[in-house]
């Protein structure tokens, strides 16, 4: 049992660790940068972009499934470290990003059509940096706190 939150060691600890979550974030940020770069290529790259976006959507969905519990528990544990307004603002920003991400995925999957390629490039240039910024912010503010409060362990290095 993990004393801080009376969590069984085998539950969250097996699914989430600092190394896993940071590794996911690094992978998501790299995939975002690569997809933005492809979106600037000629329309003939749209098939490659569709595949990359589909893979990114799967990685993000898998990550969110693991992260959700960590975020909730860490927010409670760190409540004394931040004002209520700061916590509300961070949650609102995350909720808006999730909503916008779902709309982006719905718009551009399963296939990016040739006549929408220019718009995809503009949409990708707007959405993907936001996603990268969010994972960077979570790395700084959230995961170190999750380790500090015993919500997640350090885990082993994850190579993607």
Would you name each region that the model predicts?
Residues 1-160:
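Small-residue-biased structural context
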């Amino acid at each position: 049992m993990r004393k801080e939150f009376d969590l069984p060691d085998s539950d969250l600890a097996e699914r989430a660790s600092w190394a896993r979550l940071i590794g996911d974030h690094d992978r998501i940020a790299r995939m975002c940068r690569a997809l933005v770069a492809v979106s600037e290529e000629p329309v003939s790259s749209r098939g490659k972009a569709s595949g990359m976006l589909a893979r990114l959507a799967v990685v993000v969905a898998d990550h969110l499934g693991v992260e959700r519990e960590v975020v909730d528990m860490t927010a409670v544990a760190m409540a004394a470290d931040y004002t209520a307004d700061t916590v509300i603002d961070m949650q609102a920003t995350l909720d808006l990003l999730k909503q916008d991400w779902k709309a982006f995925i719905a718009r551009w999957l399963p296939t990016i059509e040739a006549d929408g390629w220019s718009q995809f490039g503009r949409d990708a240039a707007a959405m993907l940096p936001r996603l990268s910024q969010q994972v960077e912010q979570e790395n700084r503010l959230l995961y170190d706190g999750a380790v500090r409060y015993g919500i997640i362990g350090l885990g082993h290095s994850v190579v993607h």
